[in-house]
Regions:
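Core segments of cupin and vicinal oxygen chelate
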Residues: 2-46
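Vicinal oxygen chelate
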Residues: 3-11, 39, 55-125, ...
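Short linear motifs in intrinsically disordered
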Residues: 25-30, 68, 91-95
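A short linear hydrophobic-aromatic micro-motif
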Residues: 27, 47-48, 86-91
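Conserved beta-strand in the GNAT
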Residues: 46-50, 114
Length: 125
């Protein structure tokens, strides 16, 4: 299953977790100090909250598409490169309390997008 990811910087982490829990009627799938991710079924969305250390609160940290396998990540990277986009493959990246394979591209304004798959969950950010 693929789903869009929205990663937000938030100034009041606890208030944001409470708000989005109520908004989507679900609790975070992963909750760590300053980091929460919600695996929302309806609408299909991976929502990530980051304590605002990477940018001002209320801003987008980055966007992404979660896919089911490394093959899908590689296929997305190949497709983007064939379309003339600059890509940055990042296999074996530890990020967001998970080991991931991913590929990055940036939109014309510099907004980062990633295609990624989670290989395993880990205890470090």
């Amino acid at each position: 299953m693929s789903r869009v990811q929205l990663s937000l910087n938030v100034t009041d982490f606890d208030a944001a977790v409470a708000f989005y829990s109520r908004l989507f009627s679900t609790q975070p799938a992963k909750l760590q100090p300053g980091y929460a991710n919600f695996a929302i079924a309806d609408p299909p969305l991976k929502l990530v909250l980051n304590a605002a250390g990477n940018g001002p609160g209320g801003t987008i940290n980055h966007l992404g598409v979660e896919v089911g396998s490394t093959e899908e990540v590689n296929s997305a990277g190949d497709r983007m490169a064939a379309e003339g986009l600059d890509t940055n493959p990042a296999p074996g990246t530890v990020c967001c309390y998970a080991l991931q394979d991913k590929v990055w591209a940036h939109d014309p304004d510099g907004l980062p997008w990633e295609y990624y798959t989670v290989l395993e969950h880990v205890e470090t950010p």
